[in-house]
Amino acid sequence: MTMIFDKGNVEDFDKELWDAIHAEEERQEHHIELIASENMVSKAVMAAQGSVLTNKYAESYPGNRYYGGTECVDIVETLAIERAKKLFGAAFANVQAHSGSQANAAAYMALIEAGDTVLGMDLAAGGHLTHGSPVNFSGKTYHFVGYSVDADTETLNYEAILEQAKAVQPKLIVAGASAYSRSIDFEKFRAIADHVGAYLMVDMAHIAGLVAAGVHPSPVPYAHIVTSTTHKTLRGPRGGLILTNDEALAKKINSAVFPGLQGGPLEHVIAAKAVAFKEALDPAFKDYAQAIIDNTAAMAAVFAQDDRFRLISGGTDNHVFLVDVTKVIANGKLAQNLLDEVNITLNKNAIPFETLSPFKTSGIRIGCAAITSRGMSVKESQTIARLIIKALVNHDQETILEEVRQEVRQLTDAFPLYKK
């Protein structure tokens, strides 16, 4: 009998699936990736995630598993835990959360009860679905009240947030964002939380790599719980991470993840997280993170100097920025689709005090982590900004759009994603 194990590779065994995978590899290779939540992992991360660890079930935690034969995965998970603790200066780490959303769900479960009041950043102001959107579990389970940004500066107004916290008396305050381009003052957030007797949870999913490298202030000394993804600026596999310095909360977090929300952990993904944490502990990672910030600032500055576009909040301190494109094209959705046609990938995004529907939006969101992983610098970042402007301003001129496609191809050829 021919065993399934004899099917040595995807290309030979499942050509239809392989073609789709290969097409995605080609798309990544020849498109400029500017989606702020995406990055490009190393081959070592991919190798760990594709290892035999995918075969092993390991419910519970190292040294206390429900199944036998876990001595090897215990080593793997412990490596990931210890590296995460060292990387972020935290006393405790849970690396089992399958995603950032599940990490947030576990944090909520550890800190509050269903129906409790939570103060979180409004989605339209730059927050995340899990920070209280009514269509998300967070908004359905807890009583979320949204805080926004200042109408004039489009930045967080900590005095206003304090007054709002006094008014609603939340059990928990959530800081962190998915589309906020400015540095967040976590010390001020902790002071607000302490003033009203609330817990502080920080979702640092977008900025985790910058925090790890020390180029963005860390929330770990101030938050009761910090959650994150392990991809985005951290450049690891898609997954979640939870940190705390409080032993009692660490126990609650572990119980919330397992058995509260999940069964067996994905040890192959945890191995890939361990690789990514080791990569981020290398001194060279700080140079990478600083390059992200430099590239993002350089790209944003090009838009700031063009009065046909409006840079939200006037600039950026991290890996991301938002641009109001409605002076040159009807909405962000059309901008996203047009740029897709010239092989530049980004996403439509609501801007503060948005007037269009979430399916259209006035803005686009741009992030520079992925192009920095390819080795692009300030010069290329400025070039990409000019190409975006060229395409959007001339969105009905196919000859010019073809010029942009060719210039994009020249850039991607000069900075190959995975050298053959």
From Swiss-Prot:
CDD domains in alphabetical order: SHMT
Gene Ontology MF terms in the entry: glycine hydroxymethyltransferase activity; pyridoxal phosphate binding
Oligomer and partners: Homodimer.
Sequence positions that bind (6S)-5,6,7,8-tetrahydrofolate: 123, 127-129, 357-359
Encoding gene (name): glyA
Organism: Streptococcus pyogenes serotype M4 (strain MGAS10750)
Main localization category: cytoplasm
Function: Catalyzes the reversible interconversion of serine and glycine with tetrahydrofolate (THF) serving as the one-carbon carrier. This reaction serves as the major source of one-carbon groups required for the biosynthesis of purines, thymidylate, methionine, and other important biomolecules. Also exhibits THF-independent aldolase activity toward beta-hydroxyamino acids, producing glycine and aldehydes, via a retro-aldol mechanism.
Protein name: Serine hydroxymethyltransferase
Subcellular location(s) per record: Cytoplasm
Family according to the record: Belongs to the SHMT family.
